């Protein structure tokens, strides 16, 4: 039976929902329907108040051990109370008295149907729920939320659309149905910042029970929010931690999981019902230890994120609920309808808090003339920034396709504009320091960025977006620039309009936009390895299926040729990055080498032992020809001589001209083969 969420269990958004304690007099004046709403309190009360509790006698009154201290005693036999004392909150019998809560504690036994609860039980659940602070009302104060989840400070005031009573009820119905849920909403409605918090709340109250119709045993598991990048894990976990009234992780319901996590970001007292913010790769290592799985930024089609969707769909009986969150379904709606079993689609209507104006700057050059198109684009960008300039003390973001273009455009703009220029992308280590400069500067700041800033960092003083409309899509041993998809455009545009009115200036024709099938330009070994680990049937169990299946089967044959057992592969997947699949051959040789190779993958520190080991794999590349690019760079046109992509052409930059062969150490390190 589908349960609607009674308003007394809404999450306190501190706008029109507040934490509240109900009195017995209020209960007496309620309708039967309103009283029956308190029956659902039995689930959080059993989990968080009555678990391991017992009956005590305190000053001659039977109470629950969570109410008062006293000697453990055998419970009395319960009939209908002779008298109700609302002042003392006790039921009076001829020979004894018992607290409302203790009466309910004794009556709420396994397999009892909650619709059988009478007024006597409901009064006790009201008292127990008040003690847990699980109830809410449309009146109250922010300060009343202190202590709800053990927090020392009040919850934040959140006026966003995702925490309105209507949205809360809709999300709860989808969550409790155990159907896969696809949740969309405009940028600024609070998808990532609020919906995970709401699901944490539902999990705290009702998670772990197989049904909300009757009392059963429960299996408490946390929620996980799986994200494609460490920056997002840190950003969103910190946002939700603060909004729940915590200043430190320890003892809060918030935990983080990602590779090489620093000690200070480990919650040493996590909550069983809590929420874990994790990178996709670490989410997969313990996927079924979570009750509710939230996968964010679905539109990005991060490889491991798509694999999580496939695994969760294949083994949907092992999880309670799956939420896929994305700003837009422009590219994926039809596939999701087919792929997911009976999915629920939820859209949270709403827009950014402030208006966003759009400006189109036409490029008269056809994109097929790449160099001329970019030169015209840079000239247009200077003109646009001069015409549509952020106010003093504010910033604008220029979206370009690659790290190399960040430097190219910054150099071009610095010579022509009097503003502060910065670069931010995924490989920049001092982003916080850069942002401090941006926020403290009285001048105009222009930030040049890759698609990294579409979601990974929120710039609070940004008022203008200048979008070149392109993205670099990596491919095995190369990659190419492509025009963005509709969902990427929505993400970029949504960077403004959150704090102040914004302007979105775009420099590309909308007809150039197209969906990007990332799987067609990826190494496919992870799909093979995780399919083996989770018993996926290829290719039909994949969320996105490669256009060229021959590459998938060649990858499978290549992996099989390593002669590594499935059990060993599973251990490697759980413990190492394996940025190049060939590294697996080295990880299985010795623990000492594995430790050094792992350190190289994490830090880039290349020891002689690791270099010699990788060279022994003979990952050769043949140099076909080269040409001079600039003072210290030569472009080498090469051919791959190993692996699935044997025969594929690649372009490699090196500081001097080379002939003959190179050995590949990593995707960025190459060693010339000594011809002597």
UniProtKB/Swiss-Prot annotation:
Belongs to the DEAD box helicase family. DEAH subfamily. ATP binds at residues 185-192. Keywords: ATP-binding, Helicase, Hydrolase, Nucleotide-binding, Transcription, Virion. The gene is OPG084. NTP-dependent helicase that catalyzes unidirectional unwinding of 3'tailed duplex RNAs and plays an important role during transcription of early mRNAs, presumably by preventing R-loop formation behind the elongating RNA polymerase. Might also play a role in the export of newly synthesized mRNA chains out of the core into the cytoplasm. Required for replication and propagation of viral particles. Residues 366-535 form the Helicase C-terminal domain. Its main location: virion. One of its GO terms (molecular function) is ATP binding. InterPro entries: DEAD/DEAH_box_helicase_dom, DNA/RNA_helicase_DEAH_CS, Helicase_ATP-bd, Helicase_C-like, NPH-II, P-loop_NTPase. Monomer. One of its GO terms (cellular component) is virion component. It catalyses: ATP + H2O = ADP + phosphate + H(+). This is RNA helicase NPH-II.
């Amino acid at each position: 039976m589908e349960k609607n969420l009674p308003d007394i269990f809404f999450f306190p958004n501190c706008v029109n929902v507040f934490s509240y304690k109900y009195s017995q007099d209020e209960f007496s004046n309620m309708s039967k329907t309103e009283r029956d709403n308190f029956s659902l309190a039995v689930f959080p009360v059993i989990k968080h108040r009555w678990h391991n509790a017992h009956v005590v006698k305190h000053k001659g009154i039977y109470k629950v051990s969570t109410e008062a201290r006293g000697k453990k005693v055998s419970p009395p036999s319960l009939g209908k109370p002779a008298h109700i004392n609302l002042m003392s909150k006790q039921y009076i019998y001829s020979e004894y008295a018992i607290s409302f809560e203790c009466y309910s504690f004794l009556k709420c036994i396994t397999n009892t149907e909650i619709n059988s609860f009478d007024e006597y039980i409901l009064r006790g659940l009201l008292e127990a729920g008040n003690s847990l602070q699980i109830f809410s009302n449309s009146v109250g104060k922010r300060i009343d939320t202190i202590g709800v989840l053990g927090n020392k400070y009040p919850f934040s005031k959140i006026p966003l659309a995702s925490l309105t009573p209507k949205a809360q009820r809709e999300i709860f119905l989808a969550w409790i149905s155990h159907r896969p849920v696809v949740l969309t909403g405009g940028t600024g409605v609070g998808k990532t910042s609020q919906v995970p918090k709401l699901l944490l709340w539902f999990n705290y109250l009702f998670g772990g029970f197989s049904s909300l119709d009757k009392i059963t045993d429960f299996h408490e598991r946390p929620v996980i929010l799986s994200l494609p990048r460490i920056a997002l894990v840190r950003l969103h976990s910190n946002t939700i931690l603060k909004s729940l009234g915590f200043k430190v992780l320890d003892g809060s319901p918030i935990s983080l999981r990602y590779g090489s996590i620093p000690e200070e970001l480990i919650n040493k007292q996590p909550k069983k019902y809590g929420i874990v913010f994790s990178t996709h790769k670490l989410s997969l290592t313990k996927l079924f230890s979570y009750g509710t799985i939230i996968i964010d930024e679905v539109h990005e089609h991060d490889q491991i994120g798509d694999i999580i969707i496939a695994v969760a769909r294949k083994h949907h009986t092992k999880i309670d609920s799956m939420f896929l969150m994305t700003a837009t379904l422009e590219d994926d709606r039809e596939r999701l309808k087919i792929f997911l079993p009976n999915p629920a689609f939820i859209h949270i209507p709403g827009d950014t808090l402030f208006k966003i104006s759009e400006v189109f700057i036409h490029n008269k050059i056809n994109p097929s003339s790449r160099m001329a198109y970019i030169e015209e684009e840079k000239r247009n960008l200077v003109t646009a920034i001069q015409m549509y300039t952020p106010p003093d003390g504010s910033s604008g973001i220029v979206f370009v396709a690659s790290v190399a273009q960040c430097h190219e455009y910054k150099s071009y703009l610095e010579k022509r504009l009097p503003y502060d220029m910065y670069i931010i992308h995924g490989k920049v280590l001092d982003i916080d320091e850069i942002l401090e400069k941006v926020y403290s500067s009285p001048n105009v700041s222009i930030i040049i960025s890759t698609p990294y800033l579409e979601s990974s960092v929120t710039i609070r003083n940004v008022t203008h977006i200048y979008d070149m409309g392109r993205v670099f899509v990596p491919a095995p041993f190369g990659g190419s620039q492509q025009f963005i998809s509709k969902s990427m455009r929505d993400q970029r545009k949504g960077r403004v309009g959150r704090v102040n009115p914004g302007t979105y200036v775009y420099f590309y024709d909308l007809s150039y936009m197209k969906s990007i099938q990332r799987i067609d330009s990826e190494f496919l070994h992870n799909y093979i390895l995780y399919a083996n680990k989770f018993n996926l049937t290829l290719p039909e169990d994949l969320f996105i299926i490669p256009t060229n299946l021959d590459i998938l089967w060649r990858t499978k044959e290549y992996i099989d040729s390593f002669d590594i057992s499935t059990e060993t592969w599973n251990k490697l997947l759980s413990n190492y990055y394996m940025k190049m699949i060939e590294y697996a051959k080295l990880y299985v040789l010795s623990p000492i080498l594995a430790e050094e190779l792992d350190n190289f993958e994490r830090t880039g520190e290349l020891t002689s032992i690791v270099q010699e080991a990788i060279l022994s794999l003979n990952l050769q590349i043949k140099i076909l020809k080269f040409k001079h690019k600039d003072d210290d760079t030569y472009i080498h046109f090469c051919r791959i001589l190993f692996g699935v992509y044997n025969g594929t052409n690649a372009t490699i930059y090196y500081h001097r001209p080379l002939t003959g062969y190179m050995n590949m150490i990593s995707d960025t390190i190459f060693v010339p083969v000594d011809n002597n």
